[in-house]
Amino acid sequence: MAASIFAAVPRAPPVAVFKLTADFREDGDSRKVNLGVGAYRTDEGQPWVLPVVRKVEQLIAGDGSLNHEYLPILGLPEFRANASRIALGDDSPAIAQKRVGSVQGLGGTGALRIGAEFLRRWYNGNNNTATPVYVSSPTWENHNSVFMDAGFKDIRTYRYWDAAKRGLDLQGLLDDMEKAPEFSIFILHACAHNPTGTDPTPDEWKQIAAVMKRRCLFPFFDSAYQGFASGSLDKDAWAVRYFVSEGFELFCAQSFSKNFGLYNERVGNLSVVGKDEDNVQRVLSQMEKIVRTTWSNPPSQGARIVATTLTSPQLFAEWKDNVKTMADRVLLMRSELRSRLESLGTPGTWNHITDQIGMFSFTGLNPKQVEYMIKEKHIYLMASGRINMCGLTTKNLDYVAKSIHEAVTKIQ
């Protein structure tokens, strides 16, 4: 029999976070803990369907007027409009001036990809693959892949995490922006930076915006955790809204996976802020062409759940309460873990655990210590030392804290 025409195809390495979860599932040890999963978990370690989502799903199922016809190519209009409103604010002048457009995407990744595909085709000259794209060091690993696969050839990093002080390297970040070529694209985490959990303060964001404006750099925000970081939708959108108020044209990729718990519905939105309505409409016309050959038409269920919730004052209030429940549990786990590590006298400082916000924490554990945690203690976390605070529960906190203490004291 002739060899397969695919015989020369190399096997791609597995996606790290999904491989980690697979390894966790196969582990038969009763003490095992999964701190790698990128999703919310209850104190029982279980997925949580938001009560408001259950309620809206029942409303949708009972609505005889709904059908399964195609949506518009750019997505469900009431979802797109309200998603952008959540990002930019009820009183957004940009929305009032009709210079905001949006595209429904397949989750935050889909929103990022449509933005990247458009920028490669039309930003800084037609089909300019040489425009530098800057991602934070470190960043969510998919940022690199999305922009590379969209055709950008020059992906660079800007300094962000200061390992020595376990916090933001503001001066390094600003210096890298000063040195970046004009019209470079900068991927900015709107809140709850992944993986570090370390965000700039409002004053630091102002300094970042000032440099970006002077250097003519393009802001592309990734907003995956609005409401989940601090418990406040407005506080978590502060940076995006400030940049808009400063006159920036920008993109903002939004994900509703975390704050609605709709991970497998793939609900995302790309908000486009332009100088005027005409510019935005021309951008959307090109994005429509890109969507047509990418997924052609988005799914409706998740978008309908979000739109129904955001347009009802009662459901919106209930959703905010659900989001705060998740955010508060994360804050509690941060406080409890830090307290236990300090009580154990674990070497180093641990205030960064409570200084950071959002689902993830950059522990500061090195790869050898991480390996020890996985192999000896059956506690699964990313090689970078990133942990998902939602993987902690009142039942496993003591075990995790003692294991971190052991790893830090035994392994250098």
Curated annotation (Swiss-Prot):
Miscellaneous comment in the UniProt entry for this protein: In eukaryotes there are cytoplasmic, mitochondrial and chloroplastic isozymes.
Protein name, UniProt field: Aspartate aminotransferase, cytoplasmic
Gene designation per UniProt: GOT1
Naturally occurring in which organism (per UniProt): Gallus gallus
InterPro entries: Aminotransferase_I/II_large, Asp_trans, NHTrfase_class1_PyrdxlP-BS, PyrdxlP-dep_Trfase, PyrdxlP-dep_Trfase_major, PyrdxlP-dep_Trfase_small
Family matches, as Pfam families: Aminotran_1_2 (PF00155)
A Gene Ontology BP annotation from the UniProt entry: Notch signaling pathway
Organism domain of life: Eukaryota
Matches recorded under NCBIfam families: PRK09257.1
Function: Biosynthesis of L-glutamate from L-aspartate or L-cysteine. Important regulator of levels of glutamate, the major excitatory neurotransmitter of the vertebrate central nervous system. Acts as a scavenger of glutamate in brain neuroprotection. The aspartate aminotransferase activity is involved in hepatic glucose synthesis during development and in adipocyte glyceroneogenesis. Using L-cysteine as substrate, regulates levels of mercaptopyruvate, an important source of hydrogen sulfide. Mercaptopyruvate is converted into H(2)S via the action of 3-mercaptopyruvate sulfurtransferase (3MST).
GO molecular function, one term: L-cysteine transaminase activity
Binding site for L-aspartate: 38, 140, 194, 386
